[in-house]
């Protein structure tokens, strides 16, 4: 019987749940991050996810997570134990991330940033340097040279910026962030002005940051985009070499499979 892995990317806004086998991440689901949930509510949702994928608890061989929300960790850990009969392994913590962490205080780096950087290096071993750009709650630029995690930059996120603008402006409409054009248009409505301003504004920010990073990283350098808005930004910008929305889930899969080889 094929063993499946349940992978958890526990972020500030959402929990992304991936179902994987040894060779690939097969599918993923996104649930809101809610510290107010109970172990049972999370466990029942996990059973729903598995049922939707045509699986049951007996098909799950391992549960692996990275998290930037410590308050949610024990809830999901207990849910995995009670409903799936599996211990939830965290990276880092239970599973080491084999990168030389050059941060001044290594423990300060978010687990998601390290896992994504590791995944980028494992999936794209050729270039001397890599930049992983994650369009999540924040937009992060994480730099890898060889086997070393150098650090990076943290910028505002697309959705969090849109939410902040909407909450502070009484007359502006809610932003959909849906843009069909490949080039910005001069908006003749507030909605068009906002949507194009956000998508092309973040694309320009990304291009500018990457251009400056290229000036300080030893080349050749390749750029991997991930996160919820990776495809949206990639459609209007040519600054990415690879687009992998599932980059972090791929990293968790690889970390689990290679944990005994190190």
From Swiss-Prot:
<dbReference type="InterPro" id="IPR004619">
    <property type="entry name" value="Type_III_PanK"/>
</dbReference>
<keyword id="KW-0963">Cytoplasm</keyword>
<feature type="binding site">
    <location>
        <begin position="110"/>
        <end position="113"/>
    </location>
    <ligand>
        <name>substrate</name>
    </ligand>
</feature>
<feature type="binding site">
    <location>
        <position position="134"/>
    </location>
    <ligand>
        <name>K(+)</name>
    </ligand>
</feature>
<comment type="pathway">
    <text>Cofactor biosynthesis; coenzyme A biosynthesis; CoA from (R)-pantothenate: step 1/5.</text>
</comment>
<comment type="function">
    <text>Catalyzes the phosphorylation of pantothenate (Pan), the first step in CoA biosynthesis.</text>
</comment>
<keyword id="KW-0808">Transferase</keyword>
<feature type="binding site">
    <location>
        <position position="137"/>
    </location>
    <ligand>
        <name>ATP</name>
    </ligand>
</feature>
<dbReference type="InterPro" id="IPR043129">
    <property type="entry name" value="ATPase_NBD"/>
</dbReference>
<feature type="binding site">
    <location>
        <begin position="9"/>
        <end position="16"/>
    </location>
    <ligand>
        <name>ATP</name>
    </ligand>
</feature>
<dbReference type="GO" id="GO:0005737">
    <property type="term" value="C:cytoplasm"/>
</dbReference>
<dbReference type="GO" id="GO:0005524">
    <property type="term" value="F:ATP binding"/>
</dbReference>
<dbReference type="GO" id="GO:0015937">
    <property type="term" value="P:coenzyme A biosynthetic process"/>
</dbReference>
<feature type="active site" description="Proton acceptor">
    <location>
        <position position="112"/>
    </location>
</feature>
<keyword id="KW-0547">Nucleotide-binding</keyword>
<keyword id="KW-0630">Potassium</keyword>
<dbReference type="GO" id="GO:0046872">
    <property type="term" value="F:metal ion binding"/>
</dbReference>
<comment type="similarity">
    <text>Belongs to the type III pantothenate kinase family.</text>
</comment>
<dbReference type="Pfam" id="PF03309">
    <property type="entry name" value="Pan_kinase"/>
</dbReference>
<keyword id="KW-0067">ATP-binding</keyword>
<feature type="binding site">
    <location>
        <position position="190"/>
    </location>
    <ligand>
        <name>substrate</name>
    </ligand>
</feature>
<keyword id="KW-0418">Kinase</keyword>
<comment type="subunit">
    <text>Homodimer.</text>
</comment>
<keyword id="KW-0173">Coenzyme A biosynthesis</keyword>
<protein>
    <recommendedName>
        <fullName>Type III pantothenate kinase</fullName>
        <ecNumber>2.7.1.33</ecNumber>
    </recommendedName>
</protein>
<feature type="binding site">
    <location>
        <position position="103"/>
    </location>
    <ligand>
        <name>substrate</name>
    </ligand>
</feature>
<keyword id="KW-0479">Metal-binding</keyword>
<dbReference type="GO" id="GO:0004594">
    <property type="term" value="F:pantothenate kinase activity"/>
</dbReference>
